[in-house]
Amino acid sequence: MRFFRRKIAIIVILAYAIFSLYAAYNVFFSKRVISRVHRVVKKGSVIIETGKAGEKEWNPWEEDERAHSVVVQKRRDAFRLYRDQAAKNRPKTYKVQIWGKAAIGLYLWEHILEGSLNPSDKSSQWREGEIQSGKIHFSFYTGPAVVQGHVPPDTDSVVLVLNGREQQKISYSVQWLQHVQSLIQARTISRVAVVLLGNEQCNNNWISPYLKRNGGFVDLLFLVYDSPWVNDKDIFQWPLGVATYRHFPVVTLSSQMVKKDRPYLCNFLGTIYKNSSRESLMNLLKQNNMEKDCLMHAREKWLPQETSDTSRQYQMALAQSDLTLCPVGVNSECYRIYEACAYGSVPVVEDVLTPGACAVGNRSPLRLLKDAGAPFIFLKDWKELPVILERERAMSQKEKTERRMRLLEWYSSFRQQMKDRFTEVLEENFFKIT
């Protein structure tokens, strides 16, 4: 029994010793293994450990991925640079509205700027159009329904087309100027130009107070006839153009118009006033028995509107004549000059000054046309006409065709010059573009 107890005691002591040795080994020699469930994570330790683990891991595609990222970034930078450069080089567009409250507005829009109108029906109450010229986007409004306060202003720059030929027209024009002045005071618009059909004797003092040079608000004035005001700084001369108020069309050129033999040497269809240059011209034609060579139709009373028949008759006369006789009226510049050019019929112009306050000098009258090198026939007295017609009879058809072509090319070039000049003056003065 005693032996059995001693054996048990030895086993217990031996087990204790083995356990003690095992515990000592784990404490001093074995690595710690901390359970993920129970371990305490200190702030920032995960980031540090992850970073260290990442450093130890080897990625065989790491260099390729880095190179691809560099290429993608370069492409993005190149596209961004291209986009910025394109935006910088893209021409800036400026907006200008034209309010046509006189018939010469149609000459400006359709014949000079070569814009179209919608609707095309000339009797429409409201017509409008848009066109780009230079850096300016023009929008045009005309017709009886275009009244004060009903034009949608989408810009602060406006060109107003007015008629200042007689008192009734002046009163109407003043109303529009006062309306524009109220828009300036309301800061709706800030830049204004006026295209004015001036008085035929150049008496335009009524508009002077509205000019900015005199304390008004009109920055620029484009003025018809040889006014002494013209300085090519803020006042510019503007062509009279064709009679758009009589619906004179934009003439489309054809080879037949240029090359075809015309049956008449000259034409004159118009109103004959007592004791006028026109009366002297008609008497001269009759005395020299030129009625067969020249297509003539005279009337005693001026009519503001033509019928479709008289309008067609007039245009046919221009198209069938080598020359168009242009006697002076109240002013030397008349619609007939421009209408003859449109049909390639050389204007024979009476080059004399008329009474009034228009400019006097070597370049007047018809200063604008002469400066542009108009290929017209100028005469001081209608007594020179028989010699001119005799010279015409001696010309060959080839010579007449070449002269006709030169006239048509000149008139096209003249209108282009007016378009460029009008656009450039607005660009420089409204938007400071040089």
Curated annotation (Swiss-Prot):
Endpoints of the signal sequence: none
Family statement: Belongs to the TMEM5 family.
Coiled-coil spans in chain: none
Pathway as given in its UniProt record: Protein modification; protein glycosylation
Residue ranges of the TM segments: 8-28
Source lineage: Eukaryota, Metazoa, Chordata, Craniata, Vertebrata
Gene Ontology CC terms: Golgi apparatus; Golgi membrane
Main location: Golgi
GO-annotated biological processes: protein O-linked mannosylation
GO molecular function terms noted in the UniProt entry: ribitol beta-1,4-xylosyltransferase activity
Phenotype caused by lack of the gene: Embryos display mild to severe hydrocephalus and significantly reduced eye size, reminiscent of pathological defects in Walker-Warburg syndrome.
Extracellular-facing ranges: 29-434
InterPro entries, per the entry: RXYLT1-like
Summary of the function given for this chain in its UniProt record: Acts as a UDP-D-xylose:ribitol-5-phosphate beta1,4-xylosyltransferase, which catalyzes the transfer of UDP-D-xylose to ribitol 5-phosphate (Rbo5P) to form the Xylbeta1-4Rbo5P linkage on O-mannosyl glycan. Participates in the biosynthesis of the phosphorylated O-mannosyl trisaccharide (N-acetylgalactosamine-beta-3-N-acetylglucosamine-beta-4-(phosphate-6-)mannose), a carbohydrate structure present in alpha-dystroglycan (DAG1), which is required for binding laminin G-like domain-containing extracellular proteins with high affinity.
Keywords, in A-Z order: Golgi apparatus, Membrane, Signal-anchor, Transferase, Transmembrane, Transmembrane helix
EC number: 2.4.2.61
Compartments where located: Golgi apparatus membrane
Catalyzed reactions per annotation: 3-O-[Rib-ol-P-Rib-ol-P-3-beta-D-GalNAc-(1->3)-beta-D-GlcNAc-(1->4)-(O-6-P-alpha-D-Man)]-Thr-[protein] + UDP-alpha-D-xylose = 3-O-[beta-D-Xyl-(1->4)-Rib-ol-P-Rib-ol-P-3-beta-D-GalNAc-(1->3)-beta-D-GlcNAc-(1->4)-(O-6-P-alpha-D-Man)]-Thr-[protein] + UDP + H(+)
Identification of the protein by name: Ribitol-5-phosphate xylosyltransferase 1
Topological domains, Cytoplasmic: 1-7
Membrane-protein topology: Single-pass type II membrane protein
